[in-house]
């Protein structure tokens, strides 16, 4: 899980979703998981 000031899709399978007001990126590739800090 990467914590970043700005989250972006890295590959076509990445999805940006909002959970409890926190922007997250979920993907098949675990390296692409991100959360907005």
Swiss-Prot record:
It comes from the Bacteria. The lineage of its organism: Bacteria, Pseudomonadati, Thermodesulfobacteriota, Desulfovibrionia, Desulfovibrionales. GO terms for molecular function: structural constituent of ribosome. Keywords: Ribonucleoprotein, Ribosomal protein. The keyword Nucleotide-binding does not apply. One of its GO terms (cellular component) is cytoplasm. Belongs to the bacterial ribosomal protein bL36 family. It comes from Nitratidesulfovibrio vulgaris (strain ATCC 29579 / DSM 644 / CCUG 34227 / NCIMB 8303 / VKM B-1760 / Hildenborough). Coiled coil: none annotated. This is Large ribosomal subunit protein bL36. GO terms for biological process: translation. Signal peptide: none annotated.
